[in-house]
Regions:
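Anion-binding and metal-coordination hotspots
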Residues: 1-334
Length: 334
């Protein structure tokens, strides 16, 4: 009797181990599909859950999607690429590699918003001879008429570059005590110098300067500050003002045409390869349509314009048929 109980117990343990084995294989497959991302969609493993700009419920709901990056020139789409990560900071350098693969060269000038302003991106563009007109995170705040810098922030303290020390608001020297290294999500190593004050106890400005215990310690990334100074000089120059003015009517106008005038708000296929093909067709049709409008404005011949219009209408109609079918299926499902 005891032998039968022991045998049943062993069989039960074997079944449990087999179930654990199957689950372990399933979890390994999920991790392989996930890669370096934090999430993925079951219906489209290539898509990542992101917070979209169109949030009807205003609750930060995440939806599966792709981060589409485009390059434009005179409102023509020159290049595009899809990324699984929601932040724009990590997309600039891979986008440059995609541009180089397509055109066998890198662009001479890059104009972008503050979402791309990181030390890694600034350094890449400087080393590759790209003139960067890219804002950093608080550039717009500095340009406000009533902006006054906080005298207690590390950026506002006087720095002696020869002897490598800072001077606090009370005139005390803050000597360097070491270097802090951090690794970004892309693997880039940033270095920040650490400076410490000697006697903060009893200082009348301590309540406004900092509230932690002990003496104040600041961390300064000198390389990033140098890149920001160079970016500020470029952005405030005459050429920089011209590029900043065109920034609003270049990629933003293209996205506005796509979403609102051409109702292209969602991809109609599943999988990164098919989604790339989807947008490639759209980009071709968009550029042809733009070229037709430009030729008509310049007074070109009817036959030349008709050729471009026929090609654009064919591709746009193909995409429109797909969109109509998808909409019908969604209505039936609802």
């Amino acid at each position: 009797m005891n032998l039968k109980k022991a045998l049943r117990k062993k069989k039960k343990q074997v079944r449990e181990l087999e179930g654990y084995r199957d689950k372990l294989i399933e979890y390994d497959n999920h991790l392989d599909t996930l890669g370096e991302r934090n999430s993925y969609s079951k219906t489209d493993p290539g898509a990542t859950f992101m917070r979209m700009k169109e949030d009807a419920m205003k609750n930060g709901q995440t939806k599966p999607g792709y981060n589409l990056q485009i390059g434009t020139e005179n409102q023509f789409i020159t290049d595009f690429r899809l990324f699984p990560n929601p932040t724009d900071t990590l997309t600039l350098i891979p986008f440059f590699h995609s541009f180089q693969y397509r055109y066998n060269r890198l662009p001479n000038i890059c104009v972008a918003d503050s979402g791309y302003g990181s030390e890694e991106n600034y350094r890449f563009m400087q080393e590759n001879g790209i003139e960067a007109f890219i804002k950093y995170n608080y550039f717009h705040k500095e340009q406000r008429p009533r902006y006054t810098p906080n005298p207690f922030h590390a950026e506002s303290l006087h720095y002696n570059a020869q002897e490598d020390y800072y001077v606090c608001p009370m005139g005390q020297h803050m000597n360097r005590i070491g270097t802090k290294r951090d690794k970004t999500a892309s693997g880039y190593i940033t270095e920040s110098a650490r400076y410490k004050a000697k006697r903060c106890e009893g200082c009348p400005l301590r309540g406004s300067c900092f509230k932690a215990r002990g003496n104040r310690i600041i961390e300064v990334n000198h390389r990033l500050n140098q890149y920001k100074r160079q970016a500020r000089e470029r952005l405030l120059s005459e050429e920089g003002i011209k590029h900043r003015g065109r920034r609003c009517i270049e990629p933003e106008a293209v996205f506005g045409q796509m979403k609102y005038n051409m109702t292209y708000r969602r991809f109609r296929h599943v999988g990164e390869d098919k989604v790339t093909m989807d947008f490639a067709f759209f980009a071709i049709a968009f550029n042809i349509k733009k070229m037709c409008a430009k030729l008509i404005k310049e007074g070109k011949g009817f036959i030349t314009v008709a050729k471009y219009m026929f090609m654009g209408l064919f591709i746009t109609r193909y995409n429109w048929n797909i969109a109509t079918c998808c909409q019908m299926h969604e209505e039936k499902a609802a």
